Amino acid sequence: MTQRHEDIAAVSFTGAVRTFGSVRAVDGVDLRIGRGETVALLGRNGAGKSTTIGMLLGLYPPDAGRVELFGTAPERAVRAGRVGAMPQDARPVPRVTVGELVGFVASRYPAPMPVARALELAGIAALAGRRVDRLSGGQVQRVRFAVALAGDPSLLVLDEPTAALDVEARQVFWESMRGYARRGHTVLFSTHYLEEADAFADRIVVMDRGRIVADGTGEELRRAAGGSLVAVDVAGRSPDGLALLPGVRSCEVRGGRARMRTDDSDATVIALAELGAIRGLEVTRASLDDAFLALTSSAGRPAGPGNRLSAPRDTAKAP
């Protein structure tokens, strides 16, 4: 049975594996990104993010499993101009202007975006006549964004797009990115900045040891890692048994203070009160940083349906 055009995902990984020598950089990844979604890819260094992006761009064919973009091989989608990429290690081209560079790249695609439009979306229309090798780091990063837009892609892939940018430059970049995403295109970006993922992405995919360990919204990740943190002073008394209190998923004792990650802070606090152990009581909502650390510190935790926090949303938007 032939799939309808709108049912075909922008990105599809099915049991994808990629090894480098004895290292399984990507280990059985299953991932579907619907058309029109914006998805953040998070993970520690070495988690497999860059290799996953390389497979998506056709740079690393899978050793096992399948990777498809819009229902076809990544290389075909890239050649057709359906994918724009902003790699982490791209270097500025010397002795050419911004307009010349973006225009040259656009000329290589069958149906490019008008150069003026790409420059406008990237927020660098005023820099069209400037030489690329004389721009600041933040300006060069926006030039890379314009280059990625040059083919008028349906999917934009960004590997650490705001790395090494200052706060102001990051804000300007994301304003430009929002303009692109509002046009209904699909965006996949990796980042070390959790607040960016939470603010901009529809979904956050967390990788660890080459596997997907969580996939959901920022709020769903917080709940999966334990919705709240309850802390009490335990100096002078035994912390034994705190990990067994109602709702508690984990307990860490450091410097005379116990920190409990709990799914039910009310039940945990009531149990502490019954024990007379509420000195220095503090209850806080788990942050995305807390969730990330919890999800990526579970040694050997396998990826699978049990770790998918919500079903991927396919917005069924045409490219």
PLM region spans:
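Glycine-centered loop/turn motif at secondary-structure junctions
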Residues: G123, G184, P246, L275-G276
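ABC transporter nucleotide-binding domain
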Residues: V172-T262, E282
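Non-catalytic surface loops within mature trypsin-like serine protease
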Residues: R35, A126, V234-G236, D264, ...
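Alpha-helical elements of the RecA-like P-loop NTPase motor core of helicases
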Residues: A77, P94, D240, I270, ...
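C-terminal coupling/interaction segments
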Residues: T2-R4, D263-P319
